[in-house]
UniProtKB/Swiss-Prot annotation:
Protein name in UniProt: Peptide chain release factor 1
N5-methylglutamine sites (modified residues): Q233
Role this protein plays: Peptide chain release factor 1 directs the termination of translation in response to the peptide chain termination codons UAG and UAA.
HAMAP family per record: Rel_fac_1
PANTHER family recorded: LD18447P
Family membership noted in the UniProt record: Belongs to the prokaryotic/mitochondrial release factor family.
InterPro entries in the cross-refs: PCRF, Pep_chain_release_fac_I, Pep_chain_release_fac_I_sf, Prokaryotic/Mito_RF, RF-1
Post-translational modification: Methylated by PrmC. Methylation increases the termination efficiency of RF1.
PROSITE patterns for the chain: RF_PROK_I
KW Ribosomal protein (keyword) present: no
Example of a GO MF term: translation release factor activity, codon specific
Length: 355
């Protein structure tokens, strides 16, 4: 089916759904039609704008062919054609992007997990910096940032930390943050002024609902134990810490941040559900195409995606060769949009090239 035929088909379907909704249907049929109608609304607006500009361009080109045109009128028409010819490809691209297969998880909230990698205490300090950066970004976007768990090192670093970030389309914005983030800086404990390189791993998971992943009680092993502090000492006299193991997959989540065993269990189940949902999505994507990448880069958590160089004040994303000399804005204030928008645009361009 050609691009034009596809647009006609979408407009026809939209109009038919509109007539159906106006005919007085009720119940499940009405709910289904309303959902489909709402899903098409955005692309229909773009198609109509594209068709309008395309028609105006054709009219202007036909008008230019008329013989009896004075110079002023001809210049005005040529200017209009110039504007329309520049606008039309942009509108067409917007339509084509809207036609791309949607990631069903894009509209979901997300769970972010940050873990210290190679580099010892400096890596743990960097993990804390990254975690706080995402918290600032969530605040900037108006999302709700709920800390699920933090494993402190005792001097401000995080061995690992996780949070739930709730809001519209959170996962679509943050999914490209998964991977290895590297830092180059002089640690505060470095007396010789030598630059150290360390790393932290970020994983972004779509927050799954019960309808996305069903977990059977028989598939879970739940262990409770006393929570411990950074030095290993017990900090609670009750068995409030929880470890949940999903027996079929072997995935394990342990939580001890809350004093309440019930709260730790609820948070652990939320993380477990997200990890199982992500594994389900990964397997589904692999079955669809072993060769095609569905994210910028491989989406592999072992892939080095970004370097933060404090000495030169720069942040470099290696997947799209973008370097910004504004490390304070990015790290301290969570100004990540320039990276995220470029990553999304690059991903869309790759997908368009595969059509």
């Amino acid at each position: 089916m050609s691009f034009s035929d596809n647009l006609v088909k979408i407009l026809d379907k939209y109009e038919n759904l509109g007539r159906k909704l106006s005919s007085g249907i009720i119940g499940d049929e009405f709910v289904k039609a309303s959902k489909e109608y709402a899903e098409l609304e955005d692309i229909v607006v773009k198609i109509k704008e594209y068709n309008k500009v395309k028609s105006e361009l054709e009219e202007a080109n036909n008008l230019r062919l008329e013989v009896a045109l004075d110079n002023a009128t001809l210049e005005m028409i040529n200017n209009e054609i110039y504007i329309l010819e520049n606008l039309l490809p942009k509108l067409e691209r917007a339509v084509r992007i809207s036609l791309l297969p949607k990631d069903e998880a894009d509209s979901k909230s997300a769970i972010i997990e940050v873990r210290a990698g190679s580099g010892g205490e400096e890596a743990a300090l960097f993990a804390a910096v990254l975690f706080n950066m995402y918290q600032r970004y969530a605040e900037f976007k108006g999302w709700r940032f709920e800390i699920l768990a933090i494993s402190n090192t005792g001097i401000g670093g995080y061995k690992e930390a996780s949070a739930s970030i709730k809001g519209k389309d959170v996962f679509s914005k943050l999914k490209f943050e998964s991977g290895v983030h590297r830092v180059q800086r002089v640690p505060e404990t470095e007396s010789q002024g030598r630059i150290h390189t360390s790393a932290a791993t970020v994983a972004v998971l779509p927050e799954a609902e019960g309808v996305d992943i069903k977990i059977e009680d028989k598939d879970l092993r739940i262990d409770t134990y006393r929570s411990s502090g950074a030095g290993g000492q017990h900090v609670n006299t009750t068995d409030s810490a929880v470890r949940i193991t999903h027996i079929p997959t072997g995935i394990t989540v342990a939580l001890q941040d809350e004093k309440s065993q019930h709260k730790n269990k609820a948070k652990a189940l939320k993380i477990l559900r997200a990890r199982l949902y992500e594994e389900k999505r990964r397997q589904k994507e692999q079955e669809r195409s072993d060769s095609r990448r569905w994210q910028v880069g491989s989406g592999d958590r072992s892939e080095r995606i970004r370097t933060y160089n404090f000495l030169h004040g720069r942040v470099s994303d290696h997947r799209i060769n973008l370097t910004l000399y504004k490390i304070d804005e990015v790290v301290k204030h969570g100004q990540l949009d320039e990276f995220i928008e470029a990553l999304i645009a690059n991903d869309e361009a790759k997908k368009l090239s595969e059509l």
